[in-house]
């Protein structure tokens, strides 16, 4: 079983910065905060140590999560039906977002779920 070699610290840092750019595109405040946090953690561990590969692996995994699992939403003004006070959000789903294939739904089979009669999900 072959394992992929870990990148060096600079490559991991660049990977993390690219992931923040993808995940937080259009949200300057969050993008700046995420990059500042990444820099802070890399600066704290500037010297090589025994746990350096662990920190690099953590940065690579964090970049992967940011790139594939973080979706941002923006509240859309004036949305919803008049008088109901519903809020609507527009999600920014980009090409890197991981999309599930609903295997859990397919394998659920004929399991019965108890639900309150007359209630919808938004009323709970």
Curated annotation (Swiss-Prot):
A Pfam short name: Complex1_LYR
Assigned keywords, A-Z: Chaperone, Mitochondrion, Transit peptide
UniProt-listed GO biological process terms: mitochondrial respiratory chain complex III assembly
Superkingdom of origin organism: Eukaryota
Family annotation (CDD domains): Complex1_LYR_LYRM7
Annotated function: Assembly factor required for Rieske Fe-S protein RIP1 incorporation into the cytochrome b-c1 (CIII) complex. Functions as a chaperone, binding to this subunit within the mitochondrial matrix and stabilizing it prior to its translocation and insertion into the late CIII dimeric intermediate within the mitochondrial inner membrane. Modulates the mitochondrial matrix zinc pool.
Family the UniProt entry places it in: Belongs to the complex I LYR family. MZM1 subfamily.
Protein name (record): Mitochondrial zinc maintenance protein 1, mitochondrial
Organism for this UniProt entry: Paracoccidioides lutzii (strain ATCC MYA-826 / Pb01) (Paracoccidioides brasiliensis)
Classification of source organism: Eukaryota, Fungi, Dikarya, Ascomycota, Pezizomycotina
Gene name of the encoded protein: MZM1
């Amino acid at each position: 079983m072959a394992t992929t070699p870990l990148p060096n610290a600079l490559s991991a840092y660049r990977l993390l910065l690219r992931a923040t750019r993808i995940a937080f595109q259009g949200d300057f405040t969050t993008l700046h905060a995420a990059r500042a946090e990444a820099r802070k953690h890399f600066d704290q561990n500037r010297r090589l140590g025994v746990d350096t590969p662990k920190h690099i692996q953590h940065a690579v995994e964090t970049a992967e999560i940011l790139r594939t699992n973080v979706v941002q939403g923006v509240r859309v003004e004036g949305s919803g039906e008049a008088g109901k006070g519903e809020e609507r959000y527009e999600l920014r789903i980009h090409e890197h977002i991981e999309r599930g294939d609903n295997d859990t739904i397919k394998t659920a089979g004929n399991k019965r779920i108890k639900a309150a009669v007359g209630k919808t999900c938004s009323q709970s």
